[in-house]
Curated annotation (Swiss-Prot):
Localization (cell): Cell inner membrane
Subunit structure of this chain's protein: Heterodimer of a catalytic subunit (MsrP) and a heme-binding subunit (MsrQ).
Protein name, per record: Protein-methionine-sulfoxide reductase heme-binding subunit MsrQ
Family: Belongs to the MsrQ family.
Gene that encodes the chain: msrQ
NCBIfam families referenced in this protein's UniProt entry, alphabetically: PRK05419.1-4
Membrane topology category: Multi-pass membrane protein
Length: 199
């Protein structure tokens, strides 16, 4: 069955729910005290994992559309990408306010220098910021061929973000490795595309 624009609208509603309902759960968890003895760390990890999940979902859309021969699925990619940026911003805010504290926000610059995994995180967020800011049709027309070059930086984020997660975890957990493996698989699916860049 071929997807129609009506189907895509329904899928977008599902994306909104899948991306927004975890935020409501996060708020409820904070209010009800469902987190561990270190809720600040739990919130940071939760928002970070949501960012990674949405990043991987964004990267999954193109190969899924190609292999299932459903080209209209591409219309969902921008929405997932914007939610990825939104959760990435929540992740940055949670670290800045809960880990450092509002009174020590000026320490963020020093933290970026002394903790390399934070450097990878902020680079990833800045790229997502640029992609979100230029995700409109107007920006696409304005930038021309440069638009695609800029948005190819999402592949760099797909490398940096899992490393950021792996590096930041103090105790062993399989989750960072799972996300890293999924990122490698999704990048490997684009092997021919990357190979053509070097020709």
């Amino acid at each position: 069955m071929r997807l129609t624009p009506t189907h895509i609208k329904g899928i977008k509603v599902a994306i909104y729910l899948a991306a927004f309902l975890p935020f409501l759960w996060l708020v409820l968890s904070v209010d009800q005290g469902w987190f561990s003895a270190d809720p600040a760390k739990d919130i940071q990890h939760f928002t970070g994992r949501m960012t990674l999940k949405l990043l991987l979902a964004t990267l999954m859309i193109a190969p899924l559309a190609r292999y299932t021969r459903q080209p209209l699925l591409i219309r969902c990619r921008r929405l997932v990408g914007l939610w990825c940026f939104a959760w990435g911003t929540l992740h940055l805010i949670s670290y800045s306010t809960l880990e450092l504290g509002l009174s020590n926000i000026g320490l963020l610059g020093r933290e970026l220098v002394t903790r390399p995994y934070l450097t990878l995180g902020i680079i990833s967020w800045l790229i997502l910021l640029a992609l979100a800011a230029t995700s409109t049709l107007w920006a696409m027309r304005k930038l021309g061929a440069k638009w695609q070059t800029l948005h190819n930086l999402v592949y760099l984020v797909a490398i940096l973000a899992p490393i950021h997660y792996l590096w930041s975890v103090k105790t062993f957990s399989p989750q960072p490795f799972i996300y890293a493996l999924l990122a490698v698989v999704l990048l490997a699916l684009r092997y021919k595309k990357f190979r053509n860049w070097w020709r």
